[in-house]
């Protein structure tokens, strides 16, 4: 189970270039799922990865097509960041929907990304997000400051790994997030207690600094 704030490669590729970290991560998740069709893989994603409804990011589409359960976290059930704006948005703007693929406003991330509608932008102005970065398997949990995000590739990050009873608490929290987002993380007690079940899916992110630049590695 992965809960991830930034899971994308969205930036102006005409002006900058970063390693294709998010693409490679997506490829490896899909590869692992294809190798083990019965393996349950869940990705909880923040709406900013779809530019607040302007489109569905190809990484998300590819994961869904591979049988990975992608749950878009319903950030609009969270407490209002701007209580002077969100009630107005909910009353006057949200009822009109959030069109996808009908943009006419140039994308500030560059021309390689879909154009935006005014309603996409007004939706983003609620400034709500799921900032958590959690990786969980049957025995271990990793909580990190790192995003699966190309422009963040060289950032310095920290992470903590734990096992034992705490993993059940983390799982319960992830299940609650999925439930209020109209999704479901279907993990039974029997599955929780399996020993060495697909231990290769443990996602470990290690950050270290070389010549003042942090390098990101992951193991699937």
Regions found by a protein language model. Give the residues of each.
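Charged, low-complexity intrinsically disordered terminal segments
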Residues: 1-220
